[in-house]
A protein has these predicted regions:
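N-terminal signal-anchor/first transmembrane alpha helix
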Residues: 1-12
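Periplasmic/extracellular loop-to-transmembrane helix junction in inner-membrane transport proteins
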Residues: 14-56
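Hydrophobic alpha-helical elements at and bordering transmembrane segments
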Residues: 32, 39-43, 47, 77-84, ...
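Transmembrane-helix boundary motif in ABC transporter permease subunits
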Residues: 52-82, 99
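Generic hydrophobic transmembrane alpha-helix motif, especially the helices
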Residues: 83-119, 126-127
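Glycine-rich helix-loop "coupling/hinge" segments at transmembrane-helix boundaries
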Residues: 99-100, 128, 175-189
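Transmembrane alpha-helices
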Residues: 110, 114, 147-180
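Short helix-to-coil transition segments within interhelical loops
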Residues: 128-158
Length: 189
């Protein structure tokens, strides 16, 4: 990578490429260091949108997944809506959310929630359903209630699935925050 930066610097200077078109790495790093306060302030805004949106998305997704898991009839009506919600590009919803909620942090957090909600709920619900049936039968034979089975077997078993959904959602939440800021924001990356 260091060699690429040196090559880039030499070629830009040797070919007299305009700085506005392709600035040399030395100029980029110089600007980064001289503007670190501004960049850090904007980073904090984006970071706040991502973290708050991701936490709210996880809380909402876990609660809806639990409701769907316990009420099987709801799965037939809610799950298709969840899948259909993923067909709408978030970038088309961004201007609407901006108009409805204003150009503040709330509209960006809602975009993050929308974009990161689906992988969390799908993975957590899959984890709840994937518990070995033999383990559940054995727990019932030992006298465990449905609530005990849920909290002591199914939730811990679904934790790796939840973490997998959070990994996917954490990447997409950054994309959601940046898209929201791109459509309309006064601060953020």
């Amino acid at each position: 990578i260091f060699i690429l930066f040196i090559l880039w610097e030499v070629l830009v200077r040797a070919l007299n490429v305009e700085e506005w078109f392709l600035p040399p790495p030395s100029l980029i790093f110089n600007e980064l260091f001289s503007s670190y306060k501004i960049i850090f302030d904007h980073f904090l805004t984006t970071f706040t949108e991502v973290v708050v949106g991701l936490i709210l998305s996880a809380v909402i997704a876990i609660n809806i997944a639990i409701v769907i898991f316990f009420f099987k009839n709801l799965e037939k009506s809610i799950y298709p809506l969840l899948i259909a919600s993923q067909t709408i590009p978030v970038i088309t919803l961004s201007p609407l959310l901006l108009v409805w909620f204003g150009p503040n942090i709330l509209s960006k957090i809602i975009i993050v929630i929308i974009i990161s909600f689906f992988p969390i709920i799908v993975n957590f619900l899959d984890g709840l359903k994937s518990v070995d049936a033999e383990m559940i039968k054995m727990s019932e034979q030992f006298g465990a209630s449905k609530l005990q089975i849920f909290y002591k077997i199914q939730v811990p078993y679904s934790f790796p699935y939840f973490i997998s959904g959070m990994k996917i959602a954490s990447v997409s939440s950054v994309i959601g925050a940046v898209v929201g800021e791109w459509v309309g924001a006064s601060s953020g990356l």
